[in-house]
Amino acid sequence: SNAFLEKFLAIGNFSMAVSSYFIGFTIDRYNKKKLMLFFSSICAICIFGEVVISNEIVMYVVSVIYGIGAAGLITIVPPILMTYKTEENRNFIVYNRAINIISLTIGALLAGLLTGKQFSISIKNVLLIVPILYIVSIIVFTLHDNIASKSREKSKERNFYLKKLVSERYWILIIVAFLCLGFAPLLVNFINVYFYNRYNIDVSNIAYMYALINFCSGITIFFVSKMEFKSIKCIMSMVVLIILDNIILVVWNNLYIQVCCVFAYICLFELLTSYVYDIVLSKTNSNFHGRISGVIQASCNLSETLGIYIGGVMLGLKCYWLFFGVSIISTVVSIISIIILMKEKDD
């Protein structure tokens, strides 16, 4: 039922948000490769459990456990990617995000195709593919031995970074920045609803249009990831483009322009979030990447959940100026926090 699905998803989201913070500390203490395998295994088992279990109470428990596993994977990936970072390959976090968008789009299209009239495969049987993919990723990951598990040095330098990292000002800046940055891209979770409410387009056509926009966004981000956009000027340029994009979405009703603006909206926010994430990790000691990543993920998850509820209300009332205005304000507040943080770390 819809009531069960809402509770199931809400419990999973809350589990992800809360566990991300504590998982971050675990990542800094233990071998990243083993933790990656552990979290992947949890997700595979939980997806299989969702297919075979029918009891609602047990499903809620599965949702909590899956939330922990998913939070672990999301939180651990950026610190792991930072271990591969070289002068030639600088933007792994952006590159990873591009691959995620492309694979999610392809996965959604395949799921829709397999459960459609042509193949008529049940949703539960399609879901069984997911644990298999997790197992394949575990095997591939196990064969790759180049992940460096950074040793924690008990030195004056480490103590200095510890003091700086746990300072109240530093944490507040990160939390404010990513709470706002997680909340800002309100439209991303409502693109289907937005086009349906504003233009009354057929649902199936919206689905294909959304898939095309997402796929093109992923390809664009993939190629842009080869470039370097981490100076304050570049970050500010992205923010200006986001503000202009939001304004055009409010005032210009032409459908083709709207589609182009939504494409730009996704690209800009994904690039901005990924680059800012990379900047924060690059400017801090690698011994603390796990806990920083945990705080970032917890902040983004909580604010995104809040954005889903608030954004849904505003779209339901068709308050587009308020919807995009809130997005602009949230983006600006986030970037102000990031600029202050960047200057503080440089000092």
Regions found by a protein language model. Name each.
Residues 1-4, 189-205:
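Short amphipathic helix-loop junctions that connect adjacent transmembrane helices
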Residues 146-175:
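Juxtamembrane intracellular "pre-TM" segments in multi-pass secondary transporters
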Residues 64-100:
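Cytoplasmic helix-loop-helix junction between adjacent transmembrane helices
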Residues 131-151, 337-342:
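C-terminal membrane-cytosol helix-exit motif in multi-pass small-molecule transporters
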Residues 18-54:
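Conserved MFS/SLC helix-loop-helix module at the cytosolic interface between two early adjacent transmembrane helices
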Residues 14-18, 206-228:
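Transmembrane alpha-helices of Major Facilitator/SLC transporters
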Residues 20-31, 115, 220-232, 315:
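Helix-to-loop junctions at the C-terminal end of transmembrane segments
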Residues 34-48, 233-248:
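Structural signature of the two symmetry-related core transmembrane helices
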